[in-house]
Regions:
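Class I S-adenosyl-L-methionine
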Residues: 1-264
């Protein structure tokens, strides 16, 4: 079972060199990702401490955190565990803004020659951290005009305008959440049990779902598809990207979806 590291040490914020070493270990940037789904684009990943629910006092916990998140299984899980290693040493003092600042530094170090998937692992759970990364994304795009895109479970606490020019989709777990996320200014992605085919799917409140083209085989990867890089356009058309449960924790995800649907 995937779990976040047990907190065994609490301390005051250490000296700046130690802070730098610890926070740097919680961030990774790739000029060209080896992730087959997103394709040969740039990407960043950060510790799950940045996710809603990564700390006990977070007001909302991501449904899939330590409960089937795709980032916790298979080869990706190895990288995620590495990013989480320092959690016991920083949780007493590290803030969401700290992690976002170090992810921004990692983003700044990339060439900007390719589209960039922001935090394949990780999230922004408050407005300040989203603004820090939106500014870094603007610098990234200014280099060669390439888009920075991502998904967020933090949409309940962070309105869309804090993300600036980032193409960001609200990660929703039920159809009832689509209207709420839309009201926050977001285009949406919805996790579903499975895809029947590649056809548009009617959803609640006038939304329509597009089965992820990579998952249904009509596009090779995210780079060749590009739909999630057009989040505001998707919102304007009330189109929702449907992402079928996948990864090593797929059974847990499907169980969570079923439970959430029964409570709607």
């Amino acid at each position: 079972m995937f779990t976040l590291p047990v907190v065994t040490a609490h301390s005051e914020r250490p000296d700046s060199a130690t802070v730098h070493a610890l926070l740097s270990s919680m961030v990774k940037a790739m000029e060209i990702s080896a992730n087959g789904k997103i394709g040969p684009i740039s990407a960043t990943s950060v510790s799950q401490l940045s996710c809603p629910g990564g700390q006990s006092d977070d007001p909302y916990r991501c449904t899939f955190l330590c409960a089937g998140c795709y980032a916790e299984g298979n080869m990706q899980g190895i990288h995620t565990r590495a990013l989480n290693t320092a959690i016991p040493l920083v949780i007493a003092w590290a803030t969401a803004e700290d992690i976002a600042t170090y992810e921004a530094l990692a983003l700044d170090a990339l060439t900007g020659k390719r589209p960039c998937r922001l935090h394949v692992v990780g999230d922004c759970k408050n407005a300040n951290s989203a603004r820090i990364l939106s500014q870094a994304a603007a610098r990234y795009t200014a280099k060669h005009g390439q888009v920075v895109y991502t998904y967020t479970h933090g949409w309940r606490q962070v309105s869309r305008d804090n993300w600036g020019g980032v193409s960001v989709l609200a990660s929703c777990d039920s159809q009832s959440e689509l209207k709420q996320a839309d009201a926050q200014g977001y285009g949406c992605a919805l996790v579903v049990d499975h895809h029947d085919d590649s056809k548009l799917v009617p959803l609640a409140d006038g939304f329509q779902g597009i089965p992820c083209p990579e998952q249904v085989g009509t596009k090779e990867n995210c780079k060749s598809c590009g739909l999630c890089m057009r989040a505001d356009w998707l919102k304007s058309k009330k189109l929702v990207i449907l992402l079928a449960a996948h990864g090593q924790g797929v059974k847990k995800v499907k169980a969570s979806l079923k439970e959430k649907a029964s409570n709607d």
